[in-house]
């Protein structure tokens, strides 16, 4: 796989951000900040349209990455998400039209397993990169899962989707790489005055109010549909156990979306985050009978007076276990 690092392609069609899709995704991640729902609230913060939740880019990224995991990254039975980094160069708003790029950016061998990182870049029609998303997954082979899982998935999953189809190395494979040229990074995320607390009013060590998020199996099914995530480990108990899990688990991206909403509920401005990095440690188990409770807490780790920015650490726990190994958000203060 190392020889395929650098493989790149751009989708032929652009992705247009729909106003109702913004609201639909915000509802799926339980983010009720007014800027995701109400134009007047978004305009008050200086936006030209409804602001997307920070993790919204996972929707077009998942669709764009499908070809990569079907034809370029080969030899694995399934994948487990481990890390995610969102770089918000400027907030994405409704009616933005985005070019979506995909690049296999690294393959690392650690403790006998391959860690595969894919980078998605989102460029607006003005030619400026507005968002960069780095996704790291662990490639899982047949030795790590019950052999019955393949037939179980095929009998359960919707038509035209086969997440466990293992492609072999293709002798006709041809590597395509990112074309050379200047990359222009949008600066809208650093020039707009954020609607966050004043830098002078926050201190290192300040704690964010604790928030609890409840998840049911219905929430997981809804998120699967909204985000286009067909993996049945998020709604089928039998398949989850065949995959070596204790029960159905929440999407890692859903727990990250809840975390981003937790931060913006405190800060007052979802577009004030310039970077959000999460390392997952344990999945959030969602039982059919009781669902799951996820507790989010946070504190200001550091402050930079030169840029009036800070780093906030967010912790997430469910069932007495940490589901975030480490999560940090870089925030602009007013």
List where the protein language model places each region.
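Hot-dog-fold acyl-thioester-processing enzymes
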Residues: 1-83, 147-273
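Catalytic-pocket segment enriched in acidic/His residues
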Residues: 247, 258-301
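Hydrophobic residues in beta-strands and at strand termini
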Residues: 88, 215, 280, 331-333
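HotDog/MaoC-like acyl-thioester-processing domains
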Residues: 81-83, 90-203, 286-334
């Amino acid at each position: 796989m190392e020889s395929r690092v650098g493989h790149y392609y751009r989708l032929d069609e652009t992705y247009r951000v729909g106003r109702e899709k913004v609201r639909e995704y915000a509802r799926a991640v339980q983010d009720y900040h007014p800027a995701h729902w109400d134009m007047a609230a978004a305009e008050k913060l200086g936006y030209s349209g409804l602001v997307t939740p920070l993790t919204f880019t996972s929707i077009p990224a998942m669709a764009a990455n499908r070809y990569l995991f079907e034809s370029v990254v080969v030899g694995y039975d399934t994948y487990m998400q481990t890390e995610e980094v969102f770089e918000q160069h400027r907030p994405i708003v409704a009616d933005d039209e985005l070019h979506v790029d995909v690049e296999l950016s690294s393959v690392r061998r650690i403790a006998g397993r391959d860690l595969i990182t894919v980078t998605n870049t989102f460029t607006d029609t003005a030619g400026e990169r507005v968002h960069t998303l780095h996704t790291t997954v662990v490639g899982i082979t047949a030795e790590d899962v019950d052999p019955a899982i393949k037939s179980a998935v095929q009998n359960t999953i919707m038509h035209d989707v086969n997440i466990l189809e293992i492609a072999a190395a293709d002798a006709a494979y041809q590597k395509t790489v990112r074309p050379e040229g200047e990359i222009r990074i949008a600066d809208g995320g650093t020039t707009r005055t954020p609607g966050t607390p004043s830098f002078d009013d926050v201190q290192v060590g300040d704690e964010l109010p604790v928030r609890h998020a409840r998840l049911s199996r219905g929430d997981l099914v809804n998120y699967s549909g909204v985000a286009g995530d067909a993996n049945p480990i998020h709604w089928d108990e039998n398949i989850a156990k065949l995959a070596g899990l204790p029960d159905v688990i929440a999407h890692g991206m859903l727990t990250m979306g809840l975390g981003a909403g937790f931060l913006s509920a405190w800060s007052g401005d979802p577009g004030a985050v310039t970077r959000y990095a999460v390392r997952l440690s344990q999945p959030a188990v969602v039982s059919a009978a009781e669902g799951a409770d996820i507790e989010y807490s946070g504190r200001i780790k550091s402050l930079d007076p030169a840029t009036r920015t800070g780093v906030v650490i967010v912790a997430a726990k469910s069932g007495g276990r940490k589901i975030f190994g480490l999560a940090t958000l870089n925030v602009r203060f007013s």
